[in-house]
């Protein structure tokens, strides 16, 4: 696309793409990074999110550098971690995992961390970590069984999607809502704009 530098989103997440689109930003390419997202032994939530966002950016950068059309583009990667205290909850893929996550979150506060990593056209790495505090209502067995049956939780950090049915579980949020969805928009657009990406380029025809 002429008139602005290109942007690559190093993610296959429909939620992150939708959030960027919401802000009037349309990536030129998607380059999902194949990274092992298993926390290392004893790894704390903040460190895990930061490490994985950087790893995703580095993995996607290798692909981008081999593409003549995308070489020199901005590259954006992110990773979201849900934690209760120091315990990192999985990106649930199995019914048992989802049930365990929901039981752990029931009636409690938890924190959602999203690390955003931006690679500039000059190859510099810029990174931010955003934290949001969330409190769930006390979930009944019917709540848990019904939500697990919905399948909405599959592949989601902490076993829930706040923008869906699970939004009805949330009693209180302190911090960025879009951070819980998977990409904190204020911080992401600030990061892009601060490095010279024209974040308002797509606003003209947004309606």
Swiss-Prot record:
Q: Identify the cofactor(s).
A: a divalent metal cation
What are the alphabetically sorted keywords of the record?
Answer: Cytoplasm, Hydrolase, Nucleotide metabolism
Q: Which InterPro entries match?
A: ITPase-like_fam, Maf-like
Any one biological process term the GO annotation gives: nucleotide metabolic process
Entry's localization field:
Cytoplasm
The annotated site for Important for substrate specificity falls at: 15, 80, 163
The UniProt entry, under Pfam families, shows: Maf
- Reaction(s) catalysed by this chain's protein: dTTP + H2O = dTMP + diphosphate + H(+); UTP + H2O = UMP + diphosphate + H(+)
Entry's EC annotation: 3.6.1.9
The annotated active site, in chain numbering, is: 79 (proton acceptor)
The role this protein plays is:
Nucleoside triphosphate pyrophosphatase that hydrolyzes dTTP and UTP. May have a dual role in cell division arrest and in preventing the incorporation of modified nucleotides into cellular nucleic acids.
What PANTHER family does the annotation carry? BIFUNCTIONAL DTTP/UTP PYROPHOSPHATASE/METHYLTRANSFERASE PROTEIN-RELATED, BIFUNCTIONAL DTTP_UTP PYROPHOSPHATASE_METHYLTRANSFERASE PROTEIN-RELATED
Q: What is this protein called?
A: dTTP/UTP pyrophosphatase
């Amino acid at each position: 696309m002429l008139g602005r530098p290109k942007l690559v989103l190093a993610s296959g997440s429909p939620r992150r793409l939708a959030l960027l689109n919401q802000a009037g930003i349309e990536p030129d390419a998607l380059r999902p990074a194949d990274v092992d997202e298993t926390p290392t032994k004893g790894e704390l939530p903040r460190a895990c999110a930061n490490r994985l966002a950087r790893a995703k950016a580095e993995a996607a950068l290798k692909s981008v550098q081999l593409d003549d059309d995308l070489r020199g583009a901005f590259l954006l990667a992110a990773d979201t971690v849900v934690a209760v205290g120091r315990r990192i909850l999985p990106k649930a893929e199995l019914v048992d995992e989802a049930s365990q996550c929901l039981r752990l979150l029931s009636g409690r506060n938890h924190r959602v961390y999203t690390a955003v990593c931006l690679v500039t056209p000059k190859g510099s790495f810029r990174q931010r970590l955003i934290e949001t505090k969330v409190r769930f209502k006390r979930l009944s067995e019917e709540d848990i069984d019904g939500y697990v049956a919905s399948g909405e939780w599959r592949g989601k950090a902490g076993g829930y999607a706040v923008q869906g049915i699970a939004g009805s579980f949330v009693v209180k949020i302190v911090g960025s809502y879009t951070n819980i969805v998977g990409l904190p928009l204020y911080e992401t657009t600030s990061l892009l704009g601060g490095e010279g990406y024209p974040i308002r380029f797509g606003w003209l025809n947004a309606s």
